[in-house]
C-alpha cells in the first residue's frame, strides 16, 4: 500500500510483511532502492503583491496561469472564448481544426484582434495529420506564419493529431521559431507519441 503512496518522493520502500522478508532485512548489504524523486517538479506557492500565485515550470516559461484552454474543435474554433481566456491571463489555443479556409481564418483573426486586450496573446493548435489543414496553415500556403508576420498576436504553435519524425520535428521548430513563434509544443494524443516528443525536446537546445 505504501509503495504506491511513496512514488515520486524519493523514499525507499522495504518489504517486511512476511517472516522471510524480515529475515532478509538483517542480511542487507546495500541500501534499499529508492523511488524516483519528482518533488522538484511539484507546483509551489509564491507570494506576490497581487496575492499568492501557483508557480510551475509552465508559469515560469510562459508567464501565464498554470491552467490552459486547450485547442479543441469545435469548442475553441470561434475567437470569443479564446480571447476571453487570454484576457484573463491564460494560455488559450485557437483550434486549427475549424480554420478550414483562408477567409474563415481571416474572419476569426479579425475578431480575435478586436477582442484581445493590448499585450495579450493566443496560441494556435494545428492538426499535423490532416494534410489539407497542415498545408493550408503551415505548409505550402502558410496562412498562420503570414498572419504572425503581419502582427497578429499568435505567439505559439501546438502541433497535435500526430507527431512528426525527429528530424522533421526539429526542422519544424527551427522554422517556426524563425517565423516569430517563441513557443512550439507537441501534444501527444496517446502514450506512444510521448517518448518521441521528449526526444524532440532533448534534441533542441532550450
What label would you give each PLM region?
Residues 2-4, 10-15, 21-206:
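Active-site entrance/lid segments in N-terminal catalytic domains of soluble metabolic enzymes
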